[in-house]
């Protein structure tokens, strides 16, 4: 059937990615983000959490043909090296989020891992479209609980609305990466990374973590702003009421998490399918066996 054919094609693609080659050199503790035929590794950008690249390490560790060592989950993704600390500190421009293990309290939520104030919400969406955060706990935290805290921090920051932006509140929240009036940028709950631009995907793709707050945002966006925000493919990518701007784009990068995460909230469908794969189960067990 077409479904079986798709399953086999996806499996084949994942199994034949030479994940270990993206270490750049044999003893590297990291995977690297970019390579090109003419520039090779010149960008030299390491994959380090906290961001959207957890799933890259997970798929690489799970890979049966070209897999990487499960220890790279901690040496790479969860690295505590100075380089990794500098990368994390740059998100919030503060020191309290530079370690993978955070431990600070923001808006009443104690954040076990993550950057200061949790960062943009795509951090808790992209890696968890298939990976069920309820069922993944490493030696630091359970990722459903941690992700839920990040969503709550984001909403409470928007309710406080330090910048005085038009529209922000309990039903208009969810700072994340999106199109905006002057370019494309990752908005986050920090004053230096917040310019009043709101992307519907932020709150709507957080449905599994904050169903009531996400539903409030959905109703607000559709009922009160639908005349300019809703179109043939759903919600437009972003809007900024302070400068009277709405994106002309329907961006698949932000539409997909909304569709998938709402379905995961409703039925666990994508989570159940991904987590049922034997190699996924083995990979998670490998990571969890490291103490």
Question: What kind of region is each of these model predictions?
Answer:
Residues 1, 6-291:
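Ser/Thr/Asn(+Pro)-rich, low-complexity disordered segments
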